[in-house]
């Protein structure tokens, strides 16, 4: 049954209930909805814009929980609908739909849980589900079938595809490059690792966790003596490690920019939460790169390429919605965004079209933890597997595999299903528990990972990889009873963390979770049999593989390419047009004022922000670095900055890498680094159109080698990073737009005194000459 409430602003709040509500309960809901009045009709006429019926919004999840906390029972779903004049009104088809009247069926999804399917034809299933499995991987799965003596289930094939996607396993970076007929001596990953091997400096953990950790200073920790109950606060000294991480969410942001960027920010925060046995995020960064937004007439440079029939969103919509999404998540979670960049670019030469039609959205940040907890523990048989966070929904299915290929290759339905939704409040609750456990004298966490691509199957298998584990599916929270076993196992719903905890500590952790209102579920245990399985209540296992079958033998990737020399015409300038050139340059999004990005995001929450973007009396966004303090009374802190040069990289990929590092370093130089360059570590995030055209793979190799060599010569390390190597957009008419090969470098390190950061504000000093 659905009740309709009309708010004072004329929107309609639809409330699904499992039973008839007492008049007192209806009055409570009316008060909760801002003195809304309940409609007596079961059906409402008119046109309304509201959420898609199959996607329960985060707003609904939180609203339903509020009703539960008020003592109301039987409320299942709450959504808001906005009246419009007619069906021609604009709305976002990714998240919303047009309703020609509201009735009792608006939440009905005519889907029954699909049964477990044993896959008879891997090739057909691969294409149908958009799994992006290679021929070699399918051959490998056929071998696994032979070893098992049975056909693989849809859950096993789907899960394997996500776990072993390029997005998750970075096969190109670990693969062998053969360029101009010659096998290269080192893989891309080996060249990046070389920087830390030769110059470890202060690095404690690199390349093996969700984040990189560098040795930090001793600072004060201000926290309750006991987090499981009301207690007094104490101050104690802790030996810290500094975390650095940057993540990209390019495909989801291209398809649905608000949730794509929002979940990108959320995922990067969870990466820092999931470092070691848990750590604390403190401040974020963001980068947006799109094609020209074409916001005004008369911007001649934007005519270099004709306007495309954009697959999902226009560049202007992406810039607005993506920055809204990243800002929204940080604001709701309580993480300030203190450093960032924006770039728009298109170019055409020799018949090749370059533009960020497949956009770049980078979410990065810095944080810290205790040196005690910076390395993960080793699981022992009988450890409990805990999931913390929200329910399972049909959201974010196949994101790992779909984001590993050109956007536009698969149907819009598959690509939309791969986009997650954001619920920052749920993530904050889970974080509060992790924070509490890390602040205690004895942290009970053995290991921790976040739920990202592939959901439970990826996260929980990583927790038990050394030992094997069994997950009881009836213990997992199900928000949508129509989910199949495959969808339960692999969805990316909401914000969730997987923890491995000693059995003796479960009760204590549950007390903390209850205080923080963080949903916590003990869903399984380590088994010691080197297998990983999901088991239904009836004993059927839709997923049951040996751990080494999941991780150990994915075929090696070979990248065969040849060097292609590309020549670009020299640009000619006329001195008589200097003023016109300046006028144009000042209009570029990369140059013009960024207050439309900074003014909508919290840049000071936590009380530890020493330097954010906006400076001077009128708070212009001028600062090139962000700086945070590590406690409330000390001077020690962390600085972070960014650098990129994709335009230069088009002409010379090696120069692009060097300039990206140089920009990050010249941006961070305004903060007093504790030990100079030895304090600085870099994250390198590579966005490249691999296999898009001849010569691109060779260009990537050149770019990575140049960055490695340059960092080694400067004696600095690159202990973390990420790659997104399918930066191509395909259109139904066959047109292919290639994103320029791009490396974004994030710098971070310890600051000796956060009060001595040089400001970009010029001061009129009468004593100066």
PLM region spans:
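Core nucleic-acid recognition elements
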Residues: 1-407, 412-426, 430, 434-442, ...
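Short, conserved secondary-structure segments in the cores of folded domains
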Residues: 375, 758-759
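A structural-propensity feature for long, helix-poor, extended segments
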Residues: 483-488, 493-496
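C-terminal substrate/ligand-recognition segments
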Residues: 648-649, 653-657, 661, 668-671
């Amino acid at each position: 049954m659905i009740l309709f409430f009309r708010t004072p602003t004329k929107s309609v709040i639809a409330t699904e209930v499992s039973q008839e509500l007492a008049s007192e309960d209806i009055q409570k809901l009316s008060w909760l909805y801002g003195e809304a009045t309940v409609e007596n009709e079961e059906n409402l006429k008119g046109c309304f814009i509201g959420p898609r019926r199959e996607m329960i919004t985060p707003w609904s999840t939180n609203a339903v929980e509020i009703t539960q906390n008020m003592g109301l029972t039987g409320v299942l779903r709450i959504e808001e609908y906005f009246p419009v004049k007619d069906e021609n009104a604009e709305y976002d088809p990714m998240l919303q739909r047009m309703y020609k009247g509201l009735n009792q069926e608006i939440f009905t999804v005519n889907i029954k849980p699909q049964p477990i399917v044993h896959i008879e034809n891997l090739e057909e299933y691969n294409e149908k589900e958009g799994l992006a499995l290679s021929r070699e991987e399918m051959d490998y799965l056929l071998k696994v079938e032979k070893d098992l003596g049975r056909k693989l289930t849809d859950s096993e094939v789907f899960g394997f595809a996500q776990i072993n996607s390029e997005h998750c396993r970075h096969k190109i970076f670990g693969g062998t490059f053969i360029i101009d007929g010659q096998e290269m001596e080192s893989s891309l990953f080996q060249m990046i690792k070389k920087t830390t091997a030769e110059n470890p400096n202060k690095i404690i953990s690199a390349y093996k966790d969700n984040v990189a950790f560098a040795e930090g200073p001793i600072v004060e920790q201000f926290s309750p003596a006991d987090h499981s109950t009301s207690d007094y606060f104490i101050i104690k000294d802790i030996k810290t490690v500094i975390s650095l991480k940057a993540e990209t969410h390019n495909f989801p942001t291209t398809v649905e920019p608000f949730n794509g960027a929002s979940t990108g920010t959320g995922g990067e925060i969870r990466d820092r939460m999931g470092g070691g046995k848990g750590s604390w995020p403190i401040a974020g960064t963001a980068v947006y790169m799109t094609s020209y937004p074409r916001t005004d007439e008369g911007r001649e440079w934007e005519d270099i390429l004709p306007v495309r029939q954009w697959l999902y969103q226009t560049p202007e919509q992406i810039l607005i919605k993506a920055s809204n999404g990243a800002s929204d998540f940080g604001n709701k979670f309580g993480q300030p965004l203190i450093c960032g960049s924006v770039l728009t670019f298109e170019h055409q030469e020799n018949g090749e079209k370059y533009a960020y039609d497949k956009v770049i959205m980078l979410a990065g940040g810095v944080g810290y933890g205790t040196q005690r907890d910076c390395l993960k523990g080793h699981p022992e048989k009988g450890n409990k597997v805990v999931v913390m966070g929200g329910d399972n929904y049909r959201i974010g299915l196949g994101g790992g595999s779909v984001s590993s290929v050109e956007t536009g290759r698969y149907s819009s339905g598959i690509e939309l299903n791969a986009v997650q939704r954001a619920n920052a409040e749920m993530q904050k609750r889970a974080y509060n528990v992790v924070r509490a456990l890390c602040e205690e004298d004895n942290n009970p966490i053995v290991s921790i990972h976040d739920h990202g691509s592939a959901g439970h199957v990826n996260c929980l298998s990583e927790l038990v990889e050394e030992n094997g584990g069994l997950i009881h599916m009836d213990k997992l929270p199900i928000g949508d009873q129509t989910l199949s076993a495959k969808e339960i196992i692999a969805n990316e719903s909401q914000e969730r963390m997987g923890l491995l905890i000693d059995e003796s500590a479960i009760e204590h952790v549950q007390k903390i979770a209850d205080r923080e209102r963080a949903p916590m579920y003990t869903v399984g245990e380590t088994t010691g049999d080197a297998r990983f399985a999901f088991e239904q209540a009836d004993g059927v296992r839709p997923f049951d593989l040996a751990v080494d079958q999941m991780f150990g033998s994915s075929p090696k990737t070979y990248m065969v390419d040849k060097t292609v020399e590309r020549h670009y015409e020299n640009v000619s300038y006329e001195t008589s047009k200097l003023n016109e050139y300046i006028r144009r340059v000042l209009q570029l999004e990369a140059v013009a004022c960024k207050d439309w990005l900074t003014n909508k995001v919290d840049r000071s929450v936590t009380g530890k922000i020493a330097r954010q973007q906006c400076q001077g009396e009128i708070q212009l966004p001028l600062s090139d670095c962000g700086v945070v303090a590590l406690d409330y009374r000390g001077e020690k802190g962390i600085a972070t900055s960014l650098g990129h040069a994709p335009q230069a990289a088009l002409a010379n990929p090696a120069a692009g890498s060097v300039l990206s590092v140089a920009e990050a370093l010249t941006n961070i130089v305004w903060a007093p680094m504790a030990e100079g360059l030895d304090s600085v570590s870099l994250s390198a995030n590579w966005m490249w159109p691999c296999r898009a055209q001849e010569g691109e793979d060779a260009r990537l190799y050149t770019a990575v080698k140049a960055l490695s060599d340059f960092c080694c010569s400067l004696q600095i390390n690159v202990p973390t990073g990420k790659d997104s190597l399918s930066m191509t957009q395909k259109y139904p008419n066959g047109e292919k737009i290639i994103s320029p090969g791009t490396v974004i470098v994030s710098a971070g390190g310890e600051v000796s005194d956060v009060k001595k950061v040089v400001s970009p504000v010029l001061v009129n000093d009468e004593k100066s000459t």
